[in-house]
Amino acid sequence: MSARGSGEKPSIVVLHSINFEESWTKQTYLDIERKFGEEGFTVKAIPLQIPGIRTMEGFQEKRTMILERVPVPPTLVVCIGDPSWLVARPLFDKEWKDIPSIICYARDYMYPKEEYLIDLDKNVLDTLVPITDVVKGYNATFIKYPVYIKQTIELIKKLQPELTKLAFIFDRRYISQQTKADVEAVLRKDFPGIQFEPLSTTSISTENLLDRLASFDNKTGVLYYSWYRTRKDNENRYLVDNVQKMTNSFSVPPIFTLQDVQTENGNFAGGYYVSPEDYAQVTVNT
């Protein structure tokens, strides 16, 4: 890689769709910072908090903020989560034209336009298109993050032989909605005898989620994906901020996950997924 502009130090901008607090995405940033920092790159992290945006003007404000923090076009842009790439796409049409970008934690499908990120009343599966179509014409590479749903459910069945129902914890973000649909599809195909119970931020409060978990017995498997809520949701912030710690305390059956959410701290029982360290290595070597 070479810096754009004579004498400019090469730089990498890491855009995060939300923030860098989750261990499975924080590791990617830390490895990029370590590896490329040693090679003389300046690495800048910019969290975008996209789920909190409710207007198109909000997206433009984020782009203005990005350009203020990165006045000189970077050498490379790493987008953690494809929503961050969608928000930055107008920059790749103008200020950052032809600059290479890498989309991390990508799936096969994504939204074609940023407005879908705020118009969540639409049917998610009807609006998603192949990621290859969205990035066509741009100097963009994407690294998929596999989700091992079938293997994780098989693990739950092995540890809970009386399993008759699977409760799935997720939020309003489209990646969560897409994963929920994938879980339902796997249950229909491979586990037709297991009932499905969705537990979503769109239908219950955090307090009610914890109450529901407390009512389960070992016939119910619990699979956690995400529980992101903005401050605009008027929720009990202590419960929201500590939901990952509290779910295990309230739930009788163990709680499994499809991605690493620091299972070593005892809040989750585990599952089948790619470790943050392994995924980060793939990213920095791309």
Q: What residues fall within each predicted segment?
A:
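Short hydrophobic alpha-helices and adjacent helix-cap/hinge residues
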Residues: 2-286
